[in-house]
A protein has these predicted regions:
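Polysaccharide-binding and catalytic clefts of secreted carbohydrate-active enzymes
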Residues: 21, 25-255, 261
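N-terminal low-structure segments adjacent to metalloprotease catalytic domains
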Residues: 1-30
């Protein structure tokens, strides 16, 4: 899933209604209103920099209505499902593909998906005995890549962590760090903690947590690869969040090689 922030909306009176998916491709993302929105979403009064209490806003038909202070600016930070893999969407759009099925990403951190992925890896190696190098492209989480309704690139950050989230992951993060997660830790006033920003302690905590968890899971796949008699190579690029070679956790994965595009 991915954290997204709406545009800034100025309240013309005592209420303001904010459409969530304006400027975002409906083929790429779908609003996650399944999980507790009062827990995982955040409405911000950007004029004061303070969150709006959940009892002062409501969601219906793809929009959030806020009990507002006139002329203050508001945004909504919300979770969205990635219903089309951003890299596949990029390739399809760039190359003008037609008549094809959209690929989706799945969360290997979830127990059932984790089990399936490890079994699938063993099955692939067993069924392809002529293969002696497994090249992973890459491990698990895509960097931030968002398209608008016309399938144009709206926002890209090769180092962005905003698409590496889910309530399952964030609950684990809270248990480890001992404080409550806020969407603003990732949204960062709409800057999404891009590389020109000074990261907050909370965002750095989240990055460190993600790197540890991703490295642990990637090592499991590399160990299976070695156990089955193959070398493990990582493509440096797509879905590489948490496997940055310049970070200390990377060396624990045990890869034999890294290749770039």
């Amino acid at each position: 899933q991915c954290y997204i922030m709406t545009g800034f909306y100025t309240a013309p009176g005592e209420t303001v209604t904010i459409p969530l998916m304006k400027g975002i491709s409906p083929e790429l993302m779908k609003v996650n209103d399944h999980d507790d929105i009062t827990r995982w979403w955040e409405v911000m009064d950007r004029s004061t920099g303070q969150p709006v209490p959940p009892e002062q806003w409501s969601y219906a038909d793809g929009s959030v209505t806020v009990q507002a202070v006139p002329f203050h600016e508001y945004t909504v930070s919300f979770l969205a499902y990635l219903i089309w893999d951003p890299v596949h969407m990029y390739n399809a759009t760039t190359n003008g593909w037609t008549n094809f099925e959209h690929q989706i990403t799945f969360d290997v951190r979830q127990p059932k998906t984790h089990k399936y992925s490890m079994e699938r890896l063993r099955k692939f190696i067993a069924e392809h005995p002529y293969v002696n190098v497994i090249r992973y492209t890459t491990f698990f989480h895509q960097f931030t890549l968002i398209f608008d309704e016309l399938k144009r690139e709206k926002f890209v950050d090769w180092y962005g962590y905003s698409a590496s989230v889910s309530p399952y992951i964030l609950n684990q993060f809270e248990q480890e760090v001992g404080y409550k997660f806020r969407p603003e830790y990732i949204i960062d006033q709409g800057y999404y903690n891009n590389q020109y920003r000074v990261p907050s302690k909370e965002y750095r905590d989240f990055q460190a947590f993600q790197r540890r968890e991703v490295a642990k899971l990637a090592k499991e796949m590399v160990d299976i690869t070695h156990e089955c008699g193959c070398e493990a190579m990582m493509f440096l690029g797509d879905h590489w969040i948490g496997t940055e070679p310049f970070m200390p956790e990377f060396k624990t994965i045990g890869l034999d090689a890294v290749v770039g595009s």
